[in-house]
A protein has these predicted regions:
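Active-site-proximal segments of metal-dependent phosphoesterases and phosphodiesterases across multiple
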Residues: 79-121
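Extended active-site neighborhood of metal-dependent phosphoesterases/phosphodiesterases
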Residues: 1-78, 100-101, 108, 130-135
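Active-site neighborhood of phospho(di)ester-bond hydrolases with catalytic His/Asp-centered motifs
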Residues: 6-13, 56, 83-87, 113-130
């Protein structure tokens, strides 16, 4: 059963306006930056020497996400690997990839990912598989 498995979720467009999300999923280390809508903001957790940062990009304020990443990486400097998840597919090639809010997120967040040594970015929204070069 799903209740016996650990699950790390990222808020998407179908969950963002529904208060039930926060009742079904545990989100540790939740930030308190900005508006953060009904379901909450970005959060993080560590597993071994991996830092997972889950961005609620339903909030398109990139400055808040960047501030969260900066603070989180500083608090977890001992983690060897850094993984970011977000719902919007900012690196994909499907139909949403050229929407203004997706393009803005891509241009704002990519330099931050590079600056803080993010090893992997996992996305969803377009329901299409794509990947970058081998890292």
């Amino acid at each position: 059963a799903l209740t016996s498995l650990p699950v790390a979720t990222t808020v998407g467009n179908h969950a963002a306006d529904n208060a039930n999300y926060k009742y079904h999923f545990y989100v540790p280390n939740l930030n308190n930056l900005g508006d953060n809508d009904i379901v909450g903001g970005d959060y993080y957790f560590t597993y071994g020497d991996v830092l997972f940062m889950m961005l609620n990009t339903q909030d398109t304020n990139s400055a808040e996400h960047i501030q969260f990443i900066e603070k989180t990486v500083a608090k977890n400097a001992n983690c060897k690997w850094k993984v970011v998840t977000l719902h919007q597919d900012i690196y994909g090639s499907a139909e949403h990839s050229n929407e203004p809010e997706i393009v803005n997120l891509r241009y704002a967040l990519t330099p931050t990912f590079e600056k803080y040594g993010v090893d992997d970015v996992l996305t969803g929204h377009d329901h299409a598989y794509s990947r970058s070069k081998f890292l």
